[in-house]
Amino acid sequence: MELLLGREAFLRLAEALDEPARVAFRPNDGKGFRVAGTLAAVPWSSYGHYLNERPAFTFDPLFHQGAYYVQEPSSMFVEQALRVCGLPRKVLDLCAAPGGKSTLIRSCLPPESLLVSNEPVKLRAQVLVENMLKWGHPATVVTNNYPADFGVALPGCFDVIAVDAPCSGEGMFRKDNPALEEWSTDNVMACASRQRSIVKDVWPALAEGGFLIYSTCTYNVEENERNVMWICRELGAELVKLPVDAAWNITGSLCSELSGPVYRFLPHLTEGEGFFLALLRKTVPVSQGNRRTKPVVLPKLKEPALSWLASRPEGWRLWQSGDQQWAIDGALAASVGQLLSALKVLSAGVELAMVKGRKLQPLQGLALSHCCCADAFPRVAVEGEEALAYLRRLSLTLPPSVPRGYVLLTWQGQPLGFVNNLGAHANNLYPQNWRIRSGYTTTIDNKFIERVG
């Protein structure tokens, strides 16, 4: 980095890395939340704001309700790239876990656009499912596939593909010591090679004229500028300029071989971690390939589950995977059916219910969805200790006046999750793998977000 930046700038960068990282978050406007107070805004994001300190988010029920997402501020610049892409109908976030960029992309997209959030590593994909379900938007699919699966089965399918490529992690040295310990020039070159393979494999799935948002959280030119040059030269693409305010202090190319628009975030100049982004437009036709799959036809959703959801102009369709049911917006049924036939889909639309004999048990995704019908279930408001007990998946006792059966608990007016009230006690239906494992018993006093209205 000293060779790239010069001695003085390098020393300023090193000094900045000794300072604590800034904490930022985005409220979920889809659920009616906004920033409270006068927190400093992340200048390149319509949604992001800085916090003055890092609270214990784990003990804030609103965090588990998907009221906001904690995200590294530099990476929120993806919003600027996406806004140049027009109104895409289908977007793929290829390396999406844990979900920060996907939840941001989802907030920026028109409601009718379909977002596919993918993660090839199974355990990380489960975390992605959790975070996307908490965000609550129904036009979202989560998959567990490799890049080539998209390139082979879905040629020209996507208008935008975001690749936040696995990298050497130089931009995370401040907060991630393992990244520093694992760094080597050999690892940098291996990462650069893997990144090219990832982009090459998924490239056929991008429509002609479509956009690739390529990003990393590292500094070196091999994984950044030189990979961008390779994509343009070998795959057929051109760089696209983004509207950038000079006051943001974003740095351009550090490689003399590339003069086109790329965007670097350096911690001594911007309040965030190291980040690189380039927006590229595909300039070559799509090869349709040979593989064809017949889309899955989704039947109409019926009662009683239909009454659990707010109405849609084209109704709701049903996808059942084993004993688990999902509700798909009828307007997206054909697109989701195509994905179901070609990919390993982990979640799609609204996580609705589990089949229990002849009955349906409502699931957590329904409680946290934008589309959960407000009067479909009896509601009971809980206080701080009860909310944390629920999130720890402990048994609860409800007031005698509460009817038996499925009850939706709320915290600060926002759905928290379901219980099955048996009278003497209520069975906790919170997902086992989502539960709070810490025994700490306090809730944080969240004063940085509020409900609109």
What does each model-identified segment do?
Residues M1-A36, E273, T283-G453:
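Polybasic, low-complexity RNA-engagement segments
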Residues G86, G151-D164:
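A short acidic, Gly/Pro-enriched loop at the edge of an enzyme's catalytic core
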Residues P88-A97:
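Conserved class I S-adenosyl-L-methionine
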Residues P98-P111:
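Conserved SAM-binding loop of SAM-dependent methyltransferases across substrates and taxa
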Residues P110, L206-E208:
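Helix-to-beta-strand junctions that scaffold the AdoMet/dcAdoMet cofactor pocket
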Residues L123, D159-D201, I213, C217-E225, ...:
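Mobile active-site "lid"/loop adjacent to the S-adenosyl-L-methionine
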Residues F158, F211-Y214, T218-A327, A331:
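Class I S-adenosyl-L-methionine
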